[in-house]
């Protein structure tokens, strides 16, 4: 489930975090212990932060930025933006020339606006931070490289997220499955072994939501592709995609998917797992955080691991979160100093402990947050170390993003499992629909 979906969750997701006051105290302590460049008096820096699932993390970011400003003579205003509304608000701000001085964006929006020349390139700052902290993880480095589109790197990564495989150890281990499945075939086998409605083995969404696009990753792990290496000609119809559809149909026929999973909204898999009705789901760490607070027994019975692989290897996309500076900002130096400050290990350790992100810098894996005591962060560390760039092995471009937002692959899956179409007919439709989208970007 994406961060953008989380504001739609049922009430169990909106409970206040008891440690908010502690987070505020931590921010003050961090600011006192870290030096930052002095800045000119009388200016105001506006920062738009991305509102995430964790109230602790949101408050820590606000307090830390304001504390940095107070210590450096820079008036600050931090506005936390619901990520469902980020694109709308940023687009309006660009049109009205009212952008903040710095902000958080996801990779997709950053790439789109970077292509339009909205953001300052930050190659020197990217190198400085990387050199100071052991270098950037390869997946982060590749995913965040906007040079081809924007003439340079337009953002400084601060966290990665993506889907992990969540599993019920209490159901699987009595059946002899102590380790996470390494392949999608093994996943289907384990899911079938513990399938006992109303507890279903495989809580994967096959609906027209972001979670449904996990099926793209499964297809790619079987060797299927959306398009060619140039990112222009759609290549969905293939023997490799046929192999993926066979895997899907076989699992469906075993009855391992929960009823209604082809029409779930963005919270469907979350709710199934938290209600004890799914042995496996693919999701971000938000489900684990909810279970830890609201159902500690379920949390202790859960494990988090990387997505399985297929005949062509593991496809486990990371989504990189960026801090960017609009070119229109009159506070370029101050914004750069703030972003550098926010990359310091003390702040990031505190932030990782309460946020739902994995590390981006190699030195961060040595932070206390990733010492193994938090099973969610263990999974996110593995994602950071081994995750693949968005769309890999396909080309991540505007056409691919458009195809994803139209849920072409989940719709193909629905044709097979709900409408009973044969594989060729389903692939032909998906191929034609996707090519129509790609043709718009020629």
How would you describe each model-predicted region?
Residues 63-137, 170-182, 271-272, 276-280, ...:
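Extracytoplasmic "Venus flytrap"/periplasmic binding protein-like
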Residues 50, 64, 112, 214-217, ...:
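Extracytoplasmic/periplasmic substrate-binding proteins
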Residues 1-12, 23-30:
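N-terminal secretory signal peptides
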Residues 107-162, 214-217, 303, 371-374, ...:
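Hinge/lid segment of periplasmic solute-binding proteins
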Residues 191-195, 231-261:
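Glycine-centered hinge/linker elements that transmit conformational signals in sensory
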Residues 2-8, 44, 75, 173, ...:
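Conserved C-terminal helix/tail region of periplasmic/extracytoplasmic solute-binding proteins
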Residues 127, 284-299, 311-411, 437-441:
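C-terminal lobe and pocket-closing loops
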Residues 123-139, 206, 224-243, 292-300, ...:
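Short, solvent-exposed loop/beta-turn-alpha elements that line the ligand-binding surface or hinge
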């Amino acid at each position: 489930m994406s961060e953008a979906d989380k504001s739609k969750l049922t009430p169990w997701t909106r409970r206040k975090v008891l440690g908010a006051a502690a987070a505020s105290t931590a921010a003050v302590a961090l600011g006192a212990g870290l030096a930052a460049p002095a800045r000119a008096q009388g200016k105001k820096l506006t920062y738009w932060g991305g509102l995430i699932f964790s109230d602790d993390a949101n408050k820590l970011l606000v307090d830390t930025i304001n504390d940095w400003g107070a210590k450096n003579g820079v008036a600050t205003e931090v506005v936390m933006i619901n990520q469902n509304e980020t694109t709308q608000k940023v687009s309006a701000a660009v049109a009205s020339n009212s952008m903040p001085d710095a902000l958080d964006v996801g990779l997709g929006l950053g790439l789109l606006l970077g292509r339009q020349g909205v953001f300052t390139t930050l190659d020197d700052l990217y190198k400085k931070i990387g050199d100071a902290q052991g270098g950037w993880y390869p997946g982060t480095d590749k995913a965040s490289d906007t040079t081809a589109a924007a003439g340079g790197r337009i953002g400084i990564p601060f966290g990665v997220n993506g889907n992990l495989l969540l599993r019920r150890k209490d159901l699987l281990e009595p059946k002899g499955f102590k380790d996470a499945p390494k392949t999608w075939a093994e996943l289907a086998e384990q899911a079938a072994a513990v399938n006992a409605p109303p507890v279903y083995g495989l809580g994967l969404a096959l609906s027209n939501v972001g979670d449904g696009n996990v099926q793209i990753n499964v297809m790619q792990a079987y060797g299927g592709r959306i398009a060619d290496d140039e990112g222009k000609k759609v290549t969905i119809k293939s023997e490799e995609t046929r192999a993926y559809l066979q895997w899907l149909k076989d699992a469906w026929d075993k009855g391992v998917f929960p009823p209604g999973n082809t029409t779930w909204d963005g919270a469907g898999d979350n709710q199934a797992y938290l209600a004890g009705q799914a042995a496996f789901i693919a999701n971000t760490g938000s489900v684990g955080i909810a279970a830890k607070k609201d159902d500690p027994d379920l949390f202790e019975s859960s494990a988090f691991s990387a997505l399985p692989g297929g005949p062509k290897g593991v496809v486990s996309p990371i989504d990189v979160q960026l801090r960017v500076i609009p070119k229109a900002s009159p506070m370029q130096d101050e914004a750069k100093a703030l972003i550098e400050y926010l990359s310091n290990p003390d702040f990031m350790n505190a932030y990782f402990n309460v946020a739902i992100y994995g590390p981006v810098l190699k030195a961060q894996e040595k932070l206390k947050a990733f010492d193994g005591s938090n099973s969610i962060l263990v999974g996110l560390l593995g994602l950071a170390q081994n995750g693949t760039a968005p769309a890999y092995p396909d080309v991540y471009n505007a056409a691919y993003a458009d195809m994803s937002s139209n849920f072409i692959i989940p719709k193909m899956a629905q044709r097979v499992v709900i409408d009973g179409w044969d594989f060729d007919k389903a692939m032909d439709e998906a191929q034609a629909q996707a090519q129509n989208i790609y043709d718009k970007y020629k």
